């Protein structure tokens, strides 16, 4: 049987890293847009400007929600490959060799950290939306 654990790990990790970075950006951007809206309302700015800012907040929140959904979708394959790498169910020499090599990679440790961080985000979002 042919395995390519390293390639699988790097592909899944790359998708999660990009999406997690984007999600964090949208969290920050949403906070900034809301603060800007609040300031505009407090300063009693023109109603059309406030309306445009509300639209901007909605757009940013929509992008954040979509990115969150993508993150949830991408974390599953990363979890699967990490579980496969950590499993001790195989007697296949090729698999065991690759497994040992991948476990020593910094990307494997990074993958586990991103899984933990994403699980925390999912937990927080679940609590927020409950």
Would you name each region that the model predicts?
Residues 31-54, 76-86:
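Short E/K-rich amphipathic alpha-helical oligomerization segments
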Residues 91-130:
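Long C-terminal interaction segments enriched in charged/acidic composition
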Residues 72-98:
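Coiled-coil termination/hinge junctions
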């Amino acid at each position: 049987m042919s395995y390519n654990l390293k390639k699988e790990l790097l592909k899944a990790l790359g998708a999660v890293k990009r999406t997690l970075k984007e999600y964090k950006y949208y969290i920050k951007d949403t906070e900034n847009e809301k603060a800007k809206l609040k300031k505009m309302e407090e300063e009693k700015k023109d109603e059309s400007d406030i309306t445009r800012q509300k639209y901007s907040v909605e757009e940013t929140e929509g992008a954040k929600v979509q990115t969150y959904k993508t993150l949830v979708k991408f974390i599953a394959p990363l979890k699967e490959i990490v579980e496969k790498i950590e499993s001790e169910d195989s007697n296949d020499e090729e698999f065991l060799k690759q497994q040992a090599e991948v476990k020593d990679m910094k990307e494997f440790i990074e993958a586990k950290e991103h899984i933990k961080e994403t699980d925390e985000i999912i937990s927080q979002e679940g609590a927020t939306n409950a």
